[in-house]
């Protein structure tokens, strides 16, 4: 599960039970993102900001360069390429918790059925488009571990703000930068140009308010939904407003 800093606790990060599964999962998830980025903006990273962001994420997750290049060529040449579509589902968990699911799929019927099953088994329900997304703000989010950064906080803040960041926060063990979605790439690339290591860098959904679950059964039910979504390879990201 995710941590308890100001921003990082709003996204249930997909995790697997062991390192081998985690490696396979990372390649699967990012491989699909590469395919979609190439489809939307072409195979040249210099002319495709979304692809640059995905490549940066792939490298941050230790994906080999040849795997990245093979994914780009495969998507660009349509050689055995799968046509993935981006789909979003919104719904409710116990006690009105809001959940957003983003998936990349080659079979929307299969994915919709699996997502609906995950909600139902956790005593939740899938709603209509827009039923909970208004409770979240789409933002770029960059987290920098203090242990991995030698730069002074003020200098780091100026680099981020000059590049277009909206906000800069210092936590106990990290710096957290937020941006508008359209400014995310510029801020990430400005930090990258200064050789600043980023623990994570992505466009995410930040909840405007949080829901606390005090009933043990509610917690177990929501956890069941999140676990089932974790196990679905079509699901890329799950966002919620549970204050863990």
Can you annotate each of these PLM segments?
Residues 1-127, 132-143, 183, 240-243:
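N-terminal cationic and glycine-rich segments that engage phosphates or anionic surfaces
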Residues 141-244:
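Positively charged, low-complexity, intrinsically disordered RNA-binding extensions
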């Amino acid at each position: 599960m995710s941590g308890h800093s100001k921003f990082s606790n709003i996204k249930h990060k997909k995790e697997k039970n062991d390192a081998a599964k985690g490696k396979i999962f990372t390649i699967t998830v990012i491989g699909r993102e590469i395919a979609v980025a190439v489809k939307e903006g072409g195979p040249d990273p210099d002319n495709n900001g979304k692809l640059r962001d995905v490549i940066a994420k792939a490298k941050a997750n230790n994906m080999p360069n040849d795997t990245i290049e093979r994914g780009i060529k495969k998507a660009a040449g349509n050689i055995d390429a799968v046509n993935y579509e981006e789909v979003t589902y919104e719904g409710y968990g116990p006690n009105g918790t809001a959940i957003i699911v983003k998936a990349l799929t080659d079979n929307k019927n299969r994915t919709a059925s699996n997502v609906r099953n995950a909600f139902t088994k956790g005593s939740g329900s899938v709603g209509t488009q827009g039923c909970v997304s208004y409770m979240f703000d789409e933002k770029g989010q960059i987290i920098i571990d203090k242990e991995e950064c030698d730069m002074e906080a003020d200098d780091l803040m100026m680099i981020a703000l000059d590049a277009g960041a909206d906000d800069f926060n210092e936590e106990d063990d990290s710096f957290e930068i937020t941006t508008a979605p359209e400014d995310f790439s510029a801020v990430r690339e400005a930090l990258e140009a200064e050789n600043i290591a980023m623990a994570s860098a992505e466009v995410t959904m930040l909840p405007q308010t949080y829901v606390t679950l005090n009933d043990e059964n509610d917690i177990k039910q929501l956890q069941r939904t999140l676990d089932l979504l974790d196990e679905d390879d079509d699901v890329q990201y799950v966002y919620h407003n549970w204050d863990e």
